[in-house]
């Protein structure tokens, strides 16, 4: 239901609330995210930039590049909040005449799901080059004020088990998790700047070039290509999606709570993602044994681990059943060459996750 109307921003605000989530949504974007019953009443989303904003870059049949901001369109339609058997749902749709973007949220028990559908409404084919999801957490450090209530985000970009975690600077209170669902992956990210349109150019330059926010991409062919030309080394191969007239492509994500950031990995594993713990870490001396633990709900036969381009999987040396209905698989390996290495994890039906390591010279040499 509509709880209020923001006169300054000229937007309707909708509430999705239950025993776990206290969420406000407007124009398809989360502008307030709190956990119900949180004694700290921590705000996780930036009230202006929010979570879940969609930016799409596509090419038409004439190779013209168009950038589409789904949440900033004047012509958008919100269905409002609909009550379902086990929860609440919300949907909005916007279009530029060539593509139509539908953004829906469904709150059910302890999970808030977000689904994005991109439809080619034109009569000719188009190519989706970049699809980005804006994630701006509530972070505003002011001189003389405590930094504790501010929220910081940490991201792992590596296939189907990519994720973002958000928690207070002081580590207190619950941890918010953002993760892909179904067949959706995250393959790229960047940090961008936002400027207050009410500020003049001089004021913008004097405010440290605007407020930063993170964009997460299921794929980003154009942006990755631009980054590579500027010297970036791309770990994940990017791609584009061709949509003929009337065709649709979908992306699914979930917001989850963990009681503490130390419990976030367990919560992700329960949701079907691969949670990895590596000892001694991801930067290790050449030839040093790495102990890797993978936790998930997948069976041992459904999880295969490969090192770099090897076609032979690394053998699992031990398994453990956990009380949370998850399983832990343990592996040992080492890197004999210096530099970057990739551990590829294939699981389920064509799902994949990536871990990135860097092998340094032995400690004796570095010392």
Segments the model singles out, each with a brief description of its role:
Residues 1-115, 119-213, 229-233, 240-241, ...:
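Beta-strand-rich N-terminal accessory domains
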Residues 320-331:
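Aromatic sugar-binding surface patches on proteins
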Residues 122-132, 263-266, 302-306:
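Short, hydrophobic/aromatic beta-strand segments
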